[in-house]
Amino acid sequence: MLNMADGAIGYLEDDEENHKIFSVIAKALKKGGKHFMDIMNGSYAQTHFPCKLWDAGEKGLTLSAFEWEKDRKTLIYGQVDYMYGEAFYKPEIKEGNPIRLYSLHEITEIFGKLGLRICNSFADFSGKPSSDNDIQLMVYSIRE
């Protein structure tokens, strides 16, 4: 089963909703069933947010704002896109939906209670080991 950061199963808005999602994942897997999850790393957010970034893509420029609600461990993300060849205007970055971010330690605890064992974690699709200094957290787990 795949659970990707683009919201295929859910956007991880708050703990209550997330536990429902994690429970559905655990129940959907047979013993020995495999789960791969790709989310943003809460440990990274603790030390790197708030911040503003820009990304020059093939068709345009994206300006992003990452705000961090430390007490709730919640990311508030907003962005504005500019297409090349169009006039620029002063950016007004609107807040997006809140997203509760988790550390590997938190995911390990939550999954353990649901009968999922973390086998490995990565920082990207090349297999780089996860760390608190990488924004991406990929977790590979098995249903016990």
Residues covered by each model-derived region:
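A short SAM/SAH-binding and catalytic strip from SAM-dependent methyltransferases
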Residues: 1-17
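Short catalytic/ligand-binding loop motif for oxyanion handling, primarily in non-cytosolic enzymes
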Residues: 10-12, 43-47, 130
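A short glycine-rich, Lys/Arg-flanked "PGG" loop and its adjoining helix->strand segment in the class I
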Residues: 18-34
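Short, hinge-like loop/turn segments at secondary-structure boundaries
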Residues: 2, 52-56, 137-138
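Short, glycine/charged-enriched secondary-structure capping and boundary segments
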Residues: 16-19, 50-52
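SAM-dependent methyltransferase
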Residues: 36-109
